[in-house]
Design a protein with these regions (language model features):
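Ferredoxin-type iron-sulfur electron-transfer modules in oxidoreductases and energy-metabolism complexes
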Residues: 30-43, 86-231
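Eukaryote-biased recognition of intrinsically disordered, low-complexity regulatory segments
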Residues: 1-21
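Short strand-turn-strand beta-turns centered on an Asx-Gly dipeptide
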Residues: 24, 63-67
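Short, structured protein-protein interaction patches enriched in aromatics and acidic/basic residues
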Residues: 52-61
Length: 231
């Protein structure tokens, strides 16, 4: 199978380049990550992240034939050759297919991704009704792979100002949580021309999410809440 892979080491290379590979795959190699691991045996200088191999950790997110995705759940049979692999767009390249996720996680942490509740804790846990719990479906499953945010032009242009689809999806996950008591502060922190409203609903984030989530709906709901409290 033929591959064309982005190669760049900022400490050694003057500019990025593409390197071509043609390797024979084992019949058991079904996913793109399997092929990358086999390529790593052939060329141990190739750098990429991976961990769980199950689409849970989000470590092996990359741009695959022009579309962001996870290597571990991308079936080789679905890919046209040569398979072109690039690092996630919009983030600094550390080396080859590895990007610096610092800005992505800075925006994520800025939305306070945890429950805020200063009420005296109950003897047991803070309970939710089945309906309240169900309202979090489609929100809590985010694995922070950054496929969505790095597919978003607004995040490319303003990574230091726009929270991005992943961060805003998680912001709504806590806004929608019946156990949280920080609603007004959460909305106040997003009341900004850039942090929330740079989303133009082009839905690239929805198209690439490996978990099938819909950040655009979550972002739209936050915008609606902003408008309602302003009138």
């Amino acid at each position: 199978m033929k591959f064309r892979i982005y190669r760049y080491d900022p400490e050694k290379d003057a500019k990025p380049r593409f390197q071509e590979y043609d390797i024979a795959l084992d019949p058991h190699d079904r996913m793109l990550l399997d092929a990358l691991i086999r390529l790593k045996v052939v060329d141990d200088s190739l750098a990429f992240r991976r961990s769980c191999r199950e689409g849970v950790c989000g470590s092996d997110a990359m741009n695959i034939n022009g579309r962001n995705g996870l290597a571990c759940i991308t079936n080789l049979k679905t890919l046209k050759e040569p398979v072109e692999l690039r690092p996630l767009p919009g983030l600094p390249v550390v080396r080859d297919l590895i990007v610096d996720m610092s800005q992505f996680f800075k925006q994520y942490h800025s939305i306070k991704p945890y429950l805020v509740n200063d009420e005296p804790p109950p003897e047991r846990e803070r309970l939710q009704s089945p309906e309240e719990r169900e309202s979090l479906d489609g929100l809590y499953e985010c694995i922070l792979c950054a496929c969505c945010s790095t597919a978003c032009p607004s995040f490319w242009w303003n990574p230091d100002k726009f929270v991005g689809p992943a961060g805003l999806l998680n912001a709504y996950r806590f806004i929608a949580d019946s156990r949280d008591r920080d609603l007004n502060a959460r909305l106040d922190s997003l009341e900004d021309p850039y942090r929330l409203f740079r989303c133009h609903s082009i839905m690239n984030c929805v198209d690439v999410c490996p978990k099938g989530l819909n950040p655009t709906v979550a972002i739209g709901t936050i915008k609606t809440m902003m408008i309602k409290r302003a009138v």
